[in-house]
Amino acid sequence: MPYLLMASHNPLPAGKQLLLLVLLCAFFSSSFIPFASCSITDDLQTQCLKVSATEFAGSLKDTIDAVQQVASILSQFANAFGDFRLANAISDCLDLLDFSADELNWSLSASQNQKGKNNSTGKLSSDLRTWLSAALVNQDTCSNGFEGTNSIVQGLISAGLGQVTSLVQELLTQVHPNSNQQGPNGQIPSWVKTKDRKLLQADGVSVDAIVAQDGTGNFTNVTDAVLAAPDYSMRRYVIYIKRGTYKENVEIKKKKWNLMMIGDGMDATIISGNRSFVDGWTTFRSATFAVSGRGFIARDITFENTAGPEKHQAVALRSDSDLSVFYRCNIRGYQDTLYTHTMRQFYRDCKISGTVDFIFGDATVVFQNCQILAKKGLPNQKNSITAQGRKDPNEPTGISIQFCNITADSDLEAASVNSTPTYLGRPWKLYSRTVIMQSFLSNVIRPEGWLEWNGDFALNSLFYGEYMNYGPGAGLGSRVKWPGYQVFNESTQAKNYTVAQFIEGNLWLPSTGVKYTAEFGV
């Protein structure tokens, strides 16, 4: 029975090495199956694809087969190690390959049935490019997880991951980047229930489960509440988390669709963890809170990682949730605080704090009306607010920051903003893309604005833009002179990075009830 919640204000053995090598060599010397045919409407081909619909479906099936075969080989070594970090890296890869298989299957399903329930926005070209981009980045994340390990495994699987990457990159070239196809009548997809549309704005919210440390709810920890939630739910399932500090690492797996979590306020309901790279966790697995199920919403909650700056990569929140919303949430840590890993995401009225690359990943994400706070780093360290991870020019991904306040946190203010030089971002990958617009930049931002990653890497291919920012850190006279950096002089240039255009917000944000500005109005 639902409850009513009032709105809150507040080293592998030699034998196994040989087996793995033989299996991988056998797989990668084999040929792929020929294209399979399927029945897809001519509309799909003319509006969304640059190749025949049959060829596109066949390419998807080939890529799915490649992913599954790599995963099958790697799974034989899942429990073969005593090395904690290596075991985590393999576990990550298996999960990430599983993500990729799902994303490719969604693409296949949606392209064959444009009105199916698995379609998210109803705008097929946007959905396909989003899911294919996610499938692309997963292989990179898998490889990155082997940093700090000494194992033959990384070298052996790199060929397989590279082959999957090439196949997905080819698929991305087959989808039109700017299709004229619209969602159903330009409105909210038909599968979204009307009663789900105002959950964030209602005075009362009907909840399905309550988490309370004092035993007054259905569960005393968040993880148990998540496990009890239905799989693949087509309606919103609401979990209310009462005030308190919940010291646990929460993972919302990919089958948990349309979960919503509501706390008693960002300073009242806190989910806290301390995993870090130094302690043997991969960056991906270090997250205090990780969500992969599509359609996730969080409101009035703090997600924190307390590992501290000396522990290096330590994620507070990681999202792979397509069409996810974080509203009035506090996301705090130091290095790598917020991992916007993949998919389409929206953050509104949030507080995000950290040091090095503290907003990073390869999602398509917009931040509106957020406080972005640079903290005091380690001695001789430089802060970079963003580190966007776009590796292919056909990806629609990037970071857009609009109507936000970018300032120093209290610890950096107390030490002097000059003690830790702070920059708007640096290019993690070759086609890194970040836009800052209509935001207040305090004197914490260095006059150069942006920071190199490693020499001249990506300076020609990145895309960094600024538009109508203000404040002592917004001066443009001393900004970097990189070929990939530009200042927008016209709104027509900046419009591409608004909620309406960049994340197709008008097609799905109304279903969440969250406040948002579609373009440039305050």
Curated annotation (Swiss-Prot):
Q: Which residues form the active site?
A: 336, 357
Keyword Ion transport part of the UniProt annotation = no
Reaction(s) catalysed by this chain's protein: [(1->4)-alpha-D-galacturonosyl methyl ester](n) + n H2O = [(1->4)-alpha-D-galacturonosyl](n) + n methanol + n H(+)
Return the Pfam families for the record.
Pectinesterase, PMEI
Q: Where is this region: Pectinesterase inhibitor PPE8B?
A: 31-174
Question: Which of the seven top EC classes does this enzyme belong to?
Answer: hydrolase
The cross-references to SUPFAM superfamilies, in alphabetical order and at most eight, read: Pectin lyase-like, Plant invertase/pectin methylesterase inhibitor
Asked if the keyword Disulfide bond belongs to this entry, the reply reads yes
User: Quick one: which residues bind substrate?
Assistant: 283, 313, 426, 428
Signal peptide location? 1-30
Superkingdom of origin organism: Eukaryota
Region Pectinesterase PPE8B: list its residue ranges.
208-506
Record GO terms (molecular function): enzyme inhibitor activity; pectinesterase activity
Supply any other comment: The PMEI region may act as an autoinhibitory domain and prevent untimely PME activity during transport.
Name of the protein: Pectinesterase/pectinesterase inhibitor PPE8B
- Species whose genome carries this gene: Prunus persica
